[in-house]
A protein has these predicted regions:
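Hydrophobic ligand-binding cavity/cleft-lining segments
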Residues: 1-41
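Hydrophobic/aromatic beta-strand elements that line small-molecule binding cavities or substrate pockets
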Residues: 6-8, 39, 64-71, 82, ...
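Hydrophobic/basic alpha-helical segments enriched in Actinobacteria
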Residues: 5, 30, 61, 96, ...
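Short loop segments at secondary-structure junctions
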Residues: 11-14, 72-73, 98-100
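Glycine-centered tight beta-turn/hairpin loop motif at sheet-sheet or coil-to-beta transitions
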Residues: 1, 60, 86-88
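Glycine-rich portal/gate segments that line the openings of hydrophobic small-molecule binding cavities
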Residues: 38-84, 103, 134-145
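Beta-strand/loop substructures that line and gate deep hydrophobic ligand-binding cavities in soluble
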Residues: 81-134
């Protein structure tokens, strides 16, 4: 499994940052690798809510991914898992208050599911550094607007 983690400081209060991040229908506002986010199950942002997004697959073609909220502890933490036929993504977002706003820690893991995956572990690690970098840059702007 490839993993990445980064921290972002924000002037937003923890509640405000949490509300912006858990709304997965807005993920395309901070991750340019994601399009067409929509909620497909549940109402609001509680455990079990599911969202479908489109990402660029390893073959360069659009690929749907369904994310489910596994844990929600407002305003401190939530966990989501995204799956499709090729991979499983596991993301943990924690938010800690600071004197000037909050610090968001984003921990992400990506595991290939196929018996004959399209990438070697080294290739996946290298690719995931780039994918996480795009998300980090987007989140830094999104949480500091």
């Amino acid at each position: 499994m490839a993993t990445q983690q980064f921290d972002i400081t924000s002037p937003l209060a923890p509640d405000a940052a949490f509300d912006r991040l858990i709304d997965l229908t807005r993920v395309n506002e901070w991750d340019r690798g994601v399009t067409n986010p929509r909620q497909i199950y549940g109402s609001g942002h509680e455990v079990g809510s599911r969202y479908e997004v489109t990402v660029v697959g390893f073959d360069g073609k659009p690929a749907p991914v369904v994310y489910e909220l596994l844990e929600v502890d407002r305003p401190a933490r939530f966990v989501m898992e995204g799956t499709n036929a090729v991979f499983c993504a596991h993301d943990v977002i924690t938010i800690e208050p600071t004197d000037t706003g909050c610090t968001v820690t984003y921990s992400a893991g990506l595991e290939l599911l196929e018996e004959d995956p399209p990438l070697s572990p080294a290739q996946l690690d290298s690719l995931f550094v780039k994918v996480a970098g795009v998300a980090e840059d987007g989140l830094r702007s999104y949480l500091n607007m």
